[in-house]
């Protein structure tokens, strides 16, 4: 039944159509609430989700033909960086598989001073793409940092990889 009587509780099931998703990874959305057919402006449900691919139904043959994400070096040490300096470094991502590799998303976890960019979301077999990480040290304290960056692709064997960036902020 769609009707709750006074003092009753109910369960609301929410289904998300991933086929219509425009982004991958963590996201937040709102659902409008209607009571007796009228929208209640001050009532919205906040939904948090992490959109990831489900590889569980892939056959062995599909897995053998899948892309393979290889990061040439997943750890970069930038050494000492002067406070206020902007620095760019590059992680190289290669598709060692048999079908196109897609970057689903990259999360630096620190968008206020660390941003990621890349020239192509689709990487053909045997090709590579540079993942550029830009560091803005303007508001950072003078300490040593070890920052983790999450890389998510359509590689069914290892869809999520972590890149590490080491640096020290000095005067």
Outline where the language-model segments fall:
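Long, low-complexity ectodomains and other extracytoplasmic segments of secretory-pathway proteins
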Residues: 36-92, 96-98, 156-171
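Short, hydrophobic beta-strand segments
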Residues: 12-20, 131-139
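Residue-level recognition of well-ordered beta-strand positions that form the cores
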Residues: 15, 32-34, 48, 92-94, ...
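Beta-strand-rich interaction surfaces with strong enrichment in secreted/lumenal proteins
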Residues: 2-4, 18-19, 78-79, 118-123, ...
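Short, solvent-exposed loop/turn segments enriched in Ser/Thr/Gly
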Residues: 19-32, 42-44, 83-90, 138-150
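Surface-exposed coil/turn segments at beta-strand junctions on protein surfaces, enriched
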Residues: 5-9, 22-26, 40, 82, ...
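Surface-exposed binding patches on compact interaction domains or structured appendages
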Residues: 1-11, 98-127
């Amino acid at each position: 039944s769609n009707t709750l009587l006074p003092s009753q509780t109910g369960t609301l099931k929410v289904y998300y159509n991933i086929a219509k998703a425009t982004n991958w990874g963590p996201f937040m959305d709102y659902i409008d609430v209607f009571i007796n057919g009228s929208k209640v402006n001050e009532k919205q449900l906040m939904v948090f989700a992490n959109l990831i691919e489900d590889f569980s139904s892939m056959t062995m043959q599909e897995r053998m033909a899948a892309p393979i994400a290889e990061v040439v070096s997943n750890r970069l040490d930038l050494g000492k960086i002067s406070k206020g300096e902007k620095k760019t470094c590059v992680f190289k991502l290669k598709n060692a598989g048999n079908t196109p590799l897609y970057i689903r998303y990259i999360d630096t976890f620190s968008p206020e001073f660390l941003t990621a960019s890349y020239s192509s979301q689709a990487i053909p077999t045997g090709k590579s793409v540079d993942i550029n990480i830009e560091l803005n040290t303007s508001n950072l304290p003078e300490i040593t940092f070890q920052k983790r960056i999450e890389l998510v692709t359509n590689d069914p064997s290892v869809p999520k990889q972590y890149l590490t960036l080491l640096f020290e902020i000095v005067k």
